[in-house]
Curated annotation (Swiss-Prot):
Record protein name field: N-acetylgalactosaminyltransferase 7
Binding locations of substrate: 247, 277, 412, 443
InterPro entries: GalNAc-T, Glyco_trans_2-like, Nucleotide-diphossugar_trans, Ricin_B-like_lectins, Ricin_B_lectin
Assigned GO CC terms: Golgi apparatus; Golgi membrane
UniProt organism field: Rattus norvegicus (Rat)
Gene behind this protein: Galnt7
Region (Catalytic subdomain B): 381-443
Pfam assignment, any one: Ricin_B_lectin
Length: 657
């Protein structure tokens, strides 16, 4: 078949035109200075719908858009693409999980064998007495509502007509939401900093941050006041995003209402919803993965209010040294009245270091003379062995290099110690920052709580403690088991990857940590002696056991039905002749007869001997024996009588499950 010349020419013209358009399109799309149509649409949207100016944004009026002031880190001239690394590791771990079962959710643990070097230069803050700091507000911050309730963090006391509503909200949320709902979300707060804090000048080349807030069935106004306070008091050019992680809430106000409300900020505030209840610990790790814009991750509990000029002091140490983790000074927001006051305890300035006792209960101890000598002024950051865990800042990449939280920790408890030990023993530092203050609401008595999901099983917090001490405490773990003997046989899962992490990173021993960083712990909480016996204290051949009934610091113990669940019925008697429950000792009461339980250290209340063969507890000082009344449910001491069955006891081990 013969083709006509005209047909061939027309075909060549069409093909040539198509190729020309392709070349032209490629050249236009490759020009970085010429925004794409989608980019222009986003810019038009930002111009027409600017983010609300909440004050203190550090930018010119009308310019509230996020503008990073520090570039993303480069190593040897190559931008670090962490996201591609995470995707590869996620795919690899998914393959391993399907191949070998869910042995350990260690997606983050295998990503790094070494930490990246510090490549960013940041100048030290400078104290100029009498010269107002460059991040200090020039005028008092505006009230949310002029003259409104709760402004300047003054207490709001409701009348008796609100009693029923207040009690119902405390049961549901842990706070007096009736009062909270009357207070402006943008309320002003009091300034509890030392005067010297106002005269620090910070290099403005600070790292940017993503603020991560995890919530589960939180009250509306306490959650939103947290968000509002961050936006109101954080310079806008450093606030990359606020990431809300909804940990499977079922409250209606946290669904569509929340989704619509955060549109007020045009994408600055984002919400991600877990498909099941993960618990606070793993939800925070999820938050780290979702928060991709800021160079620093700042974690806040869902019921906080940041204070005046909180950001620069908190992030400056991290900008100087990427392996530093910082913690603000945490003030107390009264859950009934919403007054903000300093936390009690600490040294003469109210400063304390984070600590623990050997049963792994969180403690605060005064700042030591050694730590004070390391500072030139009393408002400089200082070292702390541990953090409380709810509020802290850490460089995002460094947190990933550390493996985030141990993926084997469940729901809540122990994660604050795990991340603290990991930071210190593996080359980082943990600093408390006196000039950064954040108020925190503590749950009130009467809260019904948020029970863990069924898939978690029993004793998640105790299992977390066991897992942490098995990974990080080395030979010191024996002291934990002396304090919590019921946990000795508790299954804690696979920790092989965590131990490999320690080995790969040449992490230091717990002995080094106790001698160099946590050297003051044993002065406040001496190493516990070995136990002679432990378990429930049951009346011989009866179904009644000694029960503290949750009382501490002077309450009388009672006799109650044995339940074999430990808790208030779990006691131990040690080689120092102390009969103890956690950090409390049994002793005779003021009447010289009834037995009470009170806080003690290892030098107090060495009063008891247990004669196992005789089924007898003897009070050494008085020579009397431990006795009971099964009718009155009382526990007391009385003259010893070998034939008296109410003086015969047995201690039976109880293992947690």
């Amino acid at each position: 078949m013969r083709l006509k010349i005209g047909f061939i020419l027309r075909s060549l013209l069409v093909v040539g035109s198509f190729l020309g358009l392709v070349v032209l399109w490629s050249s236009l799309s490759s020009r970085p200075d010429d925004p794409s149509p989608l980019s222009r649409m986003r810019e038009d949207r930002d111009v027409n719908n600017p983010l609300p100016n909440r004050g203190g944004n550090g930018l010119a009026p009308g310019d509230d858009r996020f503008k990073p002031v520090v570039p993303w880190p480069h190593v040897e001239g190559v931008e670090v693409d962490l996201e591609s690394i995470r995707r590869k590791n996620k795919a690899k771990n998914e393959q391993e999980r399907h191949a070998g079962g869910d042995s350990q959710k260690d997606i983050m643990q295998r990503q790094y064998l070494t930490f990246k070097p510090q490549t960013f230069t940041y100048r030290d803050p400078v104290l100029r007495p009498g010269v107002l700091g460059n991040f200090e507000p020039k005028e008092p911050e505006p009230h949310g509502v002029v003259g409104g309730p709760g402004e300047n963090a003054k207490p709001l006391v409701l009348g008796p007509e609100y009693k029923q509503a207040a009690q119902a909200s405390i049961k549901e949320f842990g706070f007096n939401m009736a009062a909270s709902d009357m207070i402006s979300l943008d309320r002003s707060v009091n300034d509890l900093r030392q005067e010297e804090c106002k005269y620090w000048h910070y290099d403005e080349n600070l790292l940017t941050s993503s603020v991560v807030i995890v919530f589960h069935n939180e009250g509306w106004s306490t959650l939103m006041r947290t968000v509002h306070s961050v936006i109101k008091r954080t310079p806008r050019k450093y606030l990359a995003e606020i990431v809300l992680i909804d940990d499977f809430s079922n409250k209606e106000h946290l669904k569509e209402k929340l989704t619509e409300y955060i549109k007020l900020w045009n994408g600055l505030v984002k919400v991600f919803r877990n498909e099941r209840r993960e618990g606070l610990i793993q939800a925070r790790s999820i938050g780290a993965q979702k928060a991709k814009l800021g160079q620093v991750l700042i974690y806040l509990d869902a019921h906080c209010e940041v204070a005046v000029n909180w950001y620069a002091p908190l992030v400056a140490p991290i900008s100087k040294d990427r392996t530093i983790c910082t913690v603000p000074i945490i003030d107390v927001i009264n859950g009934n009245t919403y007054e903000i006051i300093p936390q009690g305890g600490g040294d003469e300035d109210g400063y304390a270091r984070g600590a623990w006792d050997w049963s792994m209960l969180w403690k605060r101890v005064p700042l030591t003379p050694r730590e004070k000598r390391l500072r030139k002024t009393k408002t400089e950051p200082y070292r702390s062995p541990a953090m409380a865990g709810g509020l802290f800042a850490i460089e995002r990449d460094f947190f990933f290099e550390l493996g985030l939280y141990d993926p084997g920790l469940q729901i809540w408890g122990g994660e604050n110690f795990e991340i603290s030990y990991k930071i210190w023993q593996c080359g980082g530092k943990l600093l408390f920052v006196p000039c950064s203050r954040v108020g925190h609401i503590y749950r009130l008595e009467g809260w019904q709580g948020n029970p863990p999901p069924l898939y978690v099983g029993s004793s998640p917090t105790l299992k977390n403690y066991v897992r942490v001490v098995e990974v990080w405490w080395d030979e010191y773990k024996d002291y934990f088991y002396a304090s919590r003997p019921e946990s000795k046989a508790l299954p804690y899962g696979d920790i092989s990857e965590l131990k490999k992490f320690r080995e790969d990173h040449n992490c230091k021993s717990f002995k080094w940590f106790m001698e160099e960083i946590a050297y003051d712990i044993t002065a406040h909480y001496p190493l516990p002696p070995r136990n002679v016996e432990w378990g429930e204290i049951r009346g011989l051949e009866t179904a009644y056991c000694i029960d503290s009934m949750g009382k501490t610091n002077g309450g009388f113990v009672e006799l109650g039905p044995c339940h074999r669940m430990g808790g208030n019925q779990l006691f131990r008697i040690n080689e120092a002749n102390q009969l103890m429950q956690y950090d409390q000792c049994l002793t005779k009461g003021p009447d010289g007869s009834k037995v009470m339980i009170t806080h003690c250290n290892l030098n107090e209340f060495k009063e008891w001997q247990y004669f196992k063969n005789l089924h007898r507890f003897t009070h050494i000082a008085s020579g009397k024996c431990l006795d009971r009344s099964e009718v009155l449910h009382q526990v007391f001491i009385s003259s010893c009588d070998n034939g008296k069955m109410t003086q015969k006891w047995e201690m039976n081990n109880i293992h947690s499950v």
